[in-house]
Each structure stands twice: as C-alpha cells, then as structure tokens.
Regions:
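Short, surface-exposed loop or secondary-structure junction motifs
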Residues: 1-110, 151-245
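Residue-level detector of short, conserved catalytic/binding motifs and their immediate flanks
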Residues: 139, 225, 249
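Short, surface-exposed beta-strand/loop micro-motifs that present aromatic residues
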Residues: 247-256
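Secreted, short cysteine-rich peptides and small extracellular cysteine-rich domains stabilized by multiple disulfide
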Residues: 111-150
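Beta-strand-connecting loop/turn residues
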Residues: 127, 234-236, 256-257
Length: 257
C-alpha cells in the first residue's frame, strides 16, 4: 500500500471522514481516492520495502473491526487509561483545552532553495540539506547545516516562522497522537519490561518479541513490526520517528542500558 499524498490532506481540526470510510474510498476500485498506481505498489508481497502511513491506518481499522469500537476509544480503554496516560488523545475533540497543546509552526518566505522544515530527516532532495531517516544528528548528513539553514533551522533568505493550526488527517492511526513526554515514557517502559508498566500489562511478552523481530531481513535488515532499529550513540536503538507540518518526533529504546 502506497501513500498517495494528493488525497491525504490536513484538516483544520479533526478529519471529517471516519477511518473505515476513508480506507474504503482509498483501497477499493470504486472509491473516490482510489488509484491503482497511486495507492498500490506493483511489487509482489515480500519483495520490496515501502513506508506506508495508510498501512498503519489499515492496522488501526483492523483494531476497530476486531474490538467493535473506534480506534481512539480502544486505545483510551486499553492503553492510555491502564497506563495512567492522563493527557493522551488521538483526536482534537478529545482535548478539553487546546491551549494546552503545542501550536505547530510553518516556514514561509525565502527563495525556495533553503531548508523548509526544522529537524533532521525531512529535507527534500532538491534542497541543499538532505537527510534520511537514519541520521542521528544534523551533522551526520549535512555538515554545513548551520551555514545553510541557520542554527534554528529557519534559513537565511527571508524565511519566517508563522503559526499554522491544530490539524488532523484521515489516516490518523499513522500519527497525530498528542501527549506528553512523561506519558510516552510510561508506554516505552511497558515495551522495555515485556509489556508491563507499574504492574499493568498492556501486551503479552510474546507480542513484544514479535514486534522486535526483523520481518524480512533480506529486504530491510532494520525493520520490525512498525518500529525499526538504527545505530546511535555507539549502540543499537529500537523505536520510530515521525514528521508532520511543524512537527518532528523520535522515540527510541536502548536495550543495552
């Protein structure tokens, strides 16, 4: 399943489309968003690796079908509440005070030939700084980062930061969870401890081991289930990163220490 970005818009607020309806329109030939070439790779299963946000969304919808409840509600009852993640929400409608969450910013102005996002791993190949998802620090893949992009990543050719808006998108199980670093720490602790945090089990230990297992080593030697391995600080890390408009996140575990 490929991501066809032209039909995956950001909404001002939560998506107006329910997850199941969106996926039906995306994945079925009669769907509004369907494109055989745009939505699917022509590679045979098990022969190629493609990062897929809509693949993650489809897993979220599978949770809905198996549990007979919306994905966000399932997570509330089975992950967030058991782990006492009191400030965690997939949807903006679940947040009482939007002033409590960070406003994303976007870059505007410039001449089109400077860095257009802040962070490592989200630069276009046509721009002077291009980093891939494996880089750990800016200097790993862009030795002149500060010179080209400025110390804060805002560039030097009329680039300005301006507030965007609180947004959502239809494939939301692939991202858009809003929470605190302390809450994520509880979730990560459960992974480190075989699915248990503070005496509460959210996953079986066998499930954790399956997630950690590289699925197709001949294709991608770093990819487990959703999460992946990378080298950093002279050790192997396991986790995931993500980027959206005005946002870049990383969460990794070191099983060494």
């Amino acid at each position: 399943i490929k991501d066809q970005w032209g039909v995956m818009p950001y909404y001002d607020g939560d998506s107006v489309l329910e997850l199941g309806y969106y996926l039906e329109q995306y994945l079925t030939p009669q769907g509004e968003f369907y494109s055989a070439n745009g939505c699917f790779s022509d590679s045979q299963p098990g022969t190629n690796y493609i990062y897929s946000n809509n693949g993650a969304a489809l897993i979220g919808y599978l949770v809905e079908r198996l549990s007979n409840q919306p994905f966000n509600e399932y997570c509330n009852e089975n992950i967030f509440e058991p782990l006492s993640m009191n400030n965690a929400a997939w949807l903006l409608s679940e947040i009482d005070d939007l002033n409590q969450i960070a406003m994303p910013y976007q870059l505007s102005g410039g001449n089109g030939n400077t860095c257009y996002e802040i962070g490592c791993g989200i630069y276009d190949q046509s721009n002077p700084c291009f980093c891939d998802s494996e880089c750990v620090y800016y200097d790993d893949c862009c030795s002149d980062y500060d010179e080209v992009c400025g110390e804060d990543g805002s560039g030097s050719s009329g680039i300005q930061l301006s507030p965007l808006y609180h947004y959502g998108y239809s494939d939301y199980p692939s991202g858009q969870l809003r929470t605190t670093s302390n809450n994520l720490g509880k979730f990560v602790s459960a992974y480190i401890n075989g699915g248990v945090y503070n005496g509460t089990r959210i996953l079986e230990e066998e499930t954790i081991e399956l997630i950690k297992t590289v699925q197709y080593p001949n294709i991608n030697s770093q990819q487990g289930l959703i999460w992946y391995y990378k080298n950093g600080n002279a050790q192997t890390l396991f986790g995931h990163n993500g980027g959206d408009l005005g946002s870049l996140t990383e969460m990794f575990i070191s099983y060494l220490n």
